[in-house]
Amino acid sequence: MYKDIKVDPAQLEAALDARLKIRAGFDKPTAGMAAGMTQVNMISVPKEWAYDFLLYAHRNPQSCPVLDVLEEGIYATKLAADSDIRTDFPRYRIWKDGEMVDEVTDAREIYNAHPDLVTFLIGCSFSFETALQEAGIEVRHIHDDTNVPMYLSNIECEPAGRISGNMVVSMRPIPSHQISEAVKITARMPSVHGAPVHIGHPESLGISDVNKPDFGDASRIEAGEIPVFWACGVTPQAAVMNSKIPFAISHAPGYMFITDIPDRAWMG
């Protein structure tokens, strides 16, 4: 599929430049980088747990849309040329028995010490933000140069084998008159989380204070704006915590891998 997608050479260059910048030490959230190019989340689990996770993702496609799977010992993805998933995310989280024990900017040594890890690359809602902006909908965390707010919700994912957990959601404040357009745009892109899972009432998701996200930064919500929530690719990290997987590596929330695939490739 991917080799047949026509990409503007300038966009390809921007994506490669972003990956090289990250590889050289860039350490900030990636929303808005290489605009128009798909970004992905990541989770690496031991081979013994890989089938359970693949089934978990299959049963929960809105929060865990798998775009690529890398077998143990493979670190380059077909989603991008000259790629290395051990260096091309700005920041990684290291997990042991469901607890985060470290955060690093280069994961090569850790992958080398755990050669049995299978890696899942998962669609990211950053990939529909250019389309929102082109429709005149402000993406607040890009405008304010902050990280997107993310929350552990009370929505239970469908379990698979030994893996279970709740959905993580991301939030974007949208003016009330633009919500229908935001829904239409994002619904066309199910491979990067698709339409919102909830609009308007954080408490219905178990969120007691929208200004205190579990991951990322709080967003300004102006008069006339409504909080809109989408499924989020940090959901696998919630599953790692809940299921106490013995070892895992993930991206840090908001710190993504930038691919060579344009966002429009996922539009239905």
UniProtKB/Swiss-Prot annotation:
Lineage top rank: taxon: Bacteria
This enzyme's EC code(s): 4.2.1.-
Gene3D superfamilies (alphabetical): PSTPO5379-like (3.40.1640.10), PSTPO5379-like domain (3.30.2040.10)
Name of the top EC class for this enzyme: lyase
Keywords: Lyase
InterPro entries reported for this sequence: D-Glu_cyclase, Putative_hydro-lyase, UPF0317
GO molecular function: lyase activity
Entry-linked SUPFAM superfamilies: PSTPO5379-like
Keyword Lyase attributed: yes
Name under which the protein is recorded: Putative hydro-lyase ACICU_01268
Species per Swiss-Prot/TrEMBL record: Acinetobacter baumannii (strain ACICU)
Taxonomic lineage: Bacteria, Pseudomonadati, Pseudomonadota, Gammaproteobacteria, Moraxellales
